[in-house]
Design a protein with these regions (language model features):
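Nucleotide-activated donor-binding/catalytic signature segment of Leloir-type glycosyltransferases, i.e.
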Residues: 218-265
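Short acidic/histidine- and often glycine-rich active-site loop of Leloir-type glycosyltransferases
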Residues: 288, 301-315
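Short hydrophobic beta-strand element within catalytic cores of glycosyltransferases
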Residues: 275, 295-298
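A charged, aromatic-enriched C-terminal amphipathic alpha-helix characteristic of glycosyltransferases
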Residues: 335-369
């Protein structure tokens, strides 16, 4: 270890995030390890934030929903949140907030208020791109902000998987040009955007790999509502296979998570990763794609559009089908020209776990020193 990794062993930090590991988003567990590697005494716990009277130098917020609950509707939680922040601040703690979202689409008034409190009470706000920083400054012109990129997922998934092996494992054509859209499709607009453009794309060997596309379920998701339950199961067992054959898709139900053991095979099997959001600030699928040497095509919005443009990956207007088709064509050419290797080199140089961990350690020191 060099000096920068060992000169702050006394800093105690609490990342307010569940500690039981029950999450399909590994951003925080990996970040916690990276910060620990940089010499910080850090732990993840939501319970610790609410119940402990231990001293911490840094309280590090991630998603405000992790603090108050993802479906919180208790108005008293806001008073409790303010009291806990005041308590830790009275003990000398400083607050850092990593801004993942502007506001979630489903946020109720209580969750929105939690965002307001955490945004305004944090001593330093960390952003994953300049877009987020500049937008935040318009609302909080006196805030302190830093830009720290999203880490790539080194040492997390199996990385040495060939395209051929991955496609064999997933039972996919070796000859297809595979465009993969990860993550749950959230609404009809995303479905229409992706399926409309993909159907119109003049690529003979195209295949869309979208493991969480369809709004159907084989589970009993609708309780006693027999009609909705029947429609959902009929869609799952009858419509999904039919639509997959008709439109050259390999798509599944949006309530079925990808197992972490299978995820690297989906990445390795792909030619291009498609970010299917129309309005989003950040996406972990971009750094993950960079780790797997893949070209990424995504919307010209948020930090995503900024990063893709800076690294030479195609972006598009999500409301313009012709522009999406242009971006897909450009992605196909870039995949053949080796843009994926350029992405990997960029990620390793600028988004490595080591570099991101050191940047957060430095941010902690900055917050403590004022």
């Amino acid at each position: 270890m060099n000096d920068s990794e060992t000169d702050s062993p006394s800093i105690k930090a609490l990342i307010v995030f569940r500690e039981n590991g029950e999450t399909d988003n590994l951003f925080v567990p990996i970040l916690c390890d990276a910060i620990r590697m940089a010499g910080i005494d850090v732990r993840c716990s939501t319970k610790e934030f609410w119940e402990s009277d231990k001293h911490y130098d840094i309280i590090h917020f991630q998603w405000p929903e992790e603090v108050v609950g993802w479906t919180c509707n208790d108005p008293d939680i806001i008073r409790c949140l303010e009291e806990r922040i005041s308590f830790f601040r009275s003990r000398g703690a400083r607050f850092v907030y990593t801004r993942h979202n502007v506001r979630p689409h489903y946020a109720n008034g209580i969750i929105s208020r939690a965002y307001d409190i955490i945004e305004s009470q944090s001593d330093i706000v960390a952003h994953m791109g300049r877009f987020s920083r500049d937008e935040f400054l318009t609302k909080y012109p006196d805030s302190q902000n830093v830009v720290i990129p999203h880490h790539i997922y080194q040492y997390t998934y199996k990385e040495d998987i060939s395209v051929e092996r991955a496609r064999q494992y997933l039972n996919l054509s070796q000859d297809a040009f595979i465009v993969t859209a990860f993550g749950k499709f959230r609404n009809r607009e995303e479905l229409r955007m992706v399926l409309g453009a993909f159907r119109a794309w003049d690529e003979a060997h195209k295949m869309l790999l979208a493991p969480r596309l369809y709004p159907f379920s084989r589970r009993n998701s609708y309780g006693k509502n027999f009609i909705k339950r029947w429609i959902s199961k009929a869609g799952y067992y009858l419509l999904m296979p039919l639509l997959n054959r008709m439109y050259k898709l390999q798509a599944g139900a949006n309530d079925e998570l990808i197992d972490n053991c299978d995820l690297p095979y989906y990445m390795a099997a792909s030619d291009v990763i498609f970010i299917q959001r129309k309005d989003i600030l950040n996406s972990g699928n971009v750094p993950l794609a960079f780790l797997y040497h893949k070209v990424v095509v995504g919307p010209k919005v948020g930090n995503i559009g900024e990063l893709l443009s800076e690294t030479g990956n195609p972006t598009f207007d999500p409301d313009d089908k012709k522009d999406i088709l242009r971006a897909l064509e450009e992605a196909r050419r870039l995949a053949a020209w080796g843009q994926g290797e350029v992405n990997y080199a960029y990620g390793m140089e600028n988004m490595s776990i080591r570099k991101v961990g050191q940047a957060y350690a430095q941010t902690y020191k900055q917050a403590i020193n004022g």
